[in-house]
Amino acid sequence: MALTLEALAARFGGEIVGDGRCEVGALAPLDQAGPRQLAFLANPKYLAQVETTGAGAVLIAPGDLEKLGAAAHGRNFIVTPNPYAYFARVAQMFIDLAAPPRAAGVHPSATIDPAAQVAASAVIGPHVTVEAGAVIGERAQLDANVFVGRGTRIGDDSHLYPNVAIYHGCTLGPRAIVHSGAVIGSDGFGFAPDFVGEGDARTGAWVKIPQVGGVKVGPDVEIGANTTIDRGAMADTVIDECVKIDNLVQIGHNCRIGAYTVIAGCAGIAGSTTIGKHCMIGGAVGIAGHVTLGDYVIVTAKSGVSKSLPKAGIYTSAFPAVEHGDWNRSAALVRNLDKLRDRIKALETALVAREGDAGGA
């Protein structure tokens, strides 16, 4: 389905420069777009591609349009302060228009406990299990093999992709999106040591601590594939509104993730950690337990966080990749830092002594 630039501007805002009757029916990169496709410029370093693109129209920021000057003549634009966000909204609209509607109802192979409540407008796919006391909200969609435990609530307009497991006593707010393989509400990693003796004579066991809290997920949260969020030991693990979590992320028990925070893939967050609002956690970041990150904290990829970071800012502890030989030389220097320190101290001591002798003379 194609829409005019006028129709897009009426829905999403922005100023049209050029022919508002130009129709676009899809999105494409600047260097690949055709005359019935809409492209966007989010990074000024690609400004030259706007001059050569075959796109029917381009989403562009006001300052970048000014830089084009005469090269903008004869082209069509929607001018907006944030072309990237505009692109995202248009893309979602095109997906919604193209998606075949799913008929409400329960697939015959699904298992719904009589004590569960499933909205008449919900879509329940094949082999879904919904246990007693669970509540499935209006227009929620549960794809094949989803499991919803007892007493769990799934908010209106939420979408659980195939093979998602939501354990008992959890809450998902409205418009939640949970991708395949995610597990929400599994037991937190809680064990009490009960050992006596030392060495080979040591006996005892790790005693499992029952995890009796739940997981509370706020509205408009998206959780990536194969991500796991543990239930709290006593209180709930909390994911606040509009948090976006990538694939393969581990969030330990009793954590609290503040609103609008984003967490990239393979990050691991140990239990009882609090992350503030509008934070950005890079890929493969490791965060120790019982620490607090303040609002607007950014932790770059592969960094390790071992203490609280209360102040907003960018934090890095990862070592960027270098050529193998350079790494070996650096590693050798690191191994000998203690010796270098001792030599410097000895030289400083000798220098002070020499200066003292010279002064006395």
UniProtKB/Swiss-Prot annotation:
Q: Where is the signal peptide?
A: none
Enzyme class, UniProt record, top EC level:
transferase
Read off the InterPro entries from this record. Answer: Hexapep, Hexapep_transf_CS, LpxD, Trimer_LpxA-like_sf, UDP_GlcNAc_AcTrfase_non-rep
A single Gene Ontology biological process assigned to it is: lipid A biosynthetic process
Reaction(s) the record says it catalyses: a UDP-3-O-[(3R)-3-hydroxyacyl]-alpha-D-glucosamine + a (3R)-hydroxyacyl-[ACP] = a UDP-2-N,3-O-bis[(3R)-3-hydroxyacyl]-alpha-D-glucosamine + holo-[ACP] + H(+)
GO MF terms held by the record: N-acyltransferase activity
The UniProt record lists the keyword Acyltransferase: yes
Q: Which pathway or pathways does this protein act in?
A: Bacterial outer membrane biogenesis; LPS lipid A biosynthesis
Active-site residue list = 253
Q: Which UniProt keywords apply?
A: Acyltransferase, Lipid A biosynthesis, Lipid biosynthesis, Lipid metabolism, Repeat, Transferase
Please state the Enzyme Commission number of this protein.
2.3.1.191
* Gene Ontology CC terms: membrane
Task: Read off the CDD domains from this record.
Answer: LbH_LpxD
Known partners and oligomeric status: Homotrimer.
Under PANTHER family, the record lists: UDP-3-O-ACYLGLUCOSAMINE N-ACYLTRANSFERASE, UDP-3-O-ACYLGLUCOSAMINE N-ACYLTRANSFERASE 1, MITOCHONDRIAL-RELATED
Against HAMAP family, the record matches this protein to:
LpxD
Q: Which family does it belong to?
A: Belongs to the transferase hexapeptide repeat family. LpxD subfamily.
Record function comment? Catalyzes the N-acylation of UDP-3-O-acylglucosamine using 3-hydroxyacyl-ACP as the acyl donor. Is involved in the biosynthesis of lipid A, a phosphorylated glycolipid that anchors the lipopolysaccharide to the outer membrane of the cell.
Name of the protein this chain belongs to:
UDP-3-O-acylglucosamine N-acyltransferase
